[in-house]
């Protein structure tokens, strides 16, 4: 049933992409690239050191697709922020399932770094996204951006401080997820997709 649902969703995504990109080939290409990248995760990249690549490419394609559909050019900082968000999300997403994944033979890059390494990489990537979303758009940073950046740093530091012990590692994970939520709020509230 899961495969049928995935196939149906892929067909729907391709239909939307085809309709949206009928007169603009870049829209079509970005949609196909994002979908193809996402599908490449399960095979062959999930258990390799390249496991973050599909996340980075697909997350970068999503805001690019939205901006292209609206008829605008896509700023490089937005593509980079999307890619880093996907990269960081992959490392964070693996942490809760790490033991189960390793038991089934999944050994992507985050698994090879271990839970602490994966959380550190995720935190670094997500803080880079925060900086890109604050300083990437033209003009001076908005007050909301500065406040969101401060919140991201505080949430991450709190999560790291409380999560120093392996028994409380879930707090470090929650801190990383908190920064990801701040980044999504920055992206939307900053009007980057408008």
Annotate each predicted stretch with a short phrase:
Residues 140-194:
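Extended hydrophobic alpha-helices typical of membrane-associated regions
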Residues 85-110:
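Acidic (Asp/Glu-rich) catalytic motifs at the cytosolic membrane interface
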Residues 36-49, 94-98, 156-166:
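C-terminal ends of transmembrane helices
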Residues 74-87:
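Alpha-helical transmembrane segments
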Residues 1-10, 50-55, 115-125, 146, ...:
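Select subsegments of transmembrane alpha-helices in polytopic membrane proteins
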Residues 1-74:
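Intramembrane alpha-helical segments
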Residues 53-70, 110-115, 173-190:
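Small-residue-rich segments of transmembrane alpha-helices in multi-pass membrane proteins
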Residues 1-31, 106-141:
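Multi-pass membrane catalytic core of lipid/isoprenoid biosynthesis enzymes
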């Amino acid at each position: 049933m899961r495969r049928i649902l995935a196939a149906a969703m892929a067909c729907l995504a391709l239909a939307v992409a085809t309709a949206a990109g009928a007169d603009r080939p870049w829209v079509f290409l970005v949609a196909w690239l994002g979908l193809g990248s996402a599908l490449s995760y399960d095979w062959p990249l999930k258990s390799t050191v390249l496991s973050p690549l599909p996340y980075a490419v697909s997350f970068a394609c999503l805001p690019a697709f939205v901006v292209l559909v609206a008829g605008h050019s896509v700023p490089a900082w937005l593509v980079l922020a999307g890619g880093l968000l996907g990269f960081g999300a992959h490392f964070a997403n693996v942490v809760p399932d790490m033991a189960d994944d390793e038991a089934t033979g999944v050994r992507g890059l985050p698994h090879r770094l271990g839970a602490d390494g994966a959380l550190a990489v995720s935190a670094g990537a997500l803080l880079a996204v925060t900086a890109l979303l604050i300083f990437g758009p033209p003009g001076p940073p908005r007050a909301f951006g500065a406040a969101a950046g401060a919140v991201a740093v505080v949430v991450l530091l709190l999560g790291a401080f409380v999560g120093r012990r392996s028994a409380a590692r879930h707090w470090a994970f929650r801190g990383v997820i908190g920064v990801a939520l701040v980044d999504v709020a920055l992206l939307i509230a900053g009007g980057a997709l408008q």
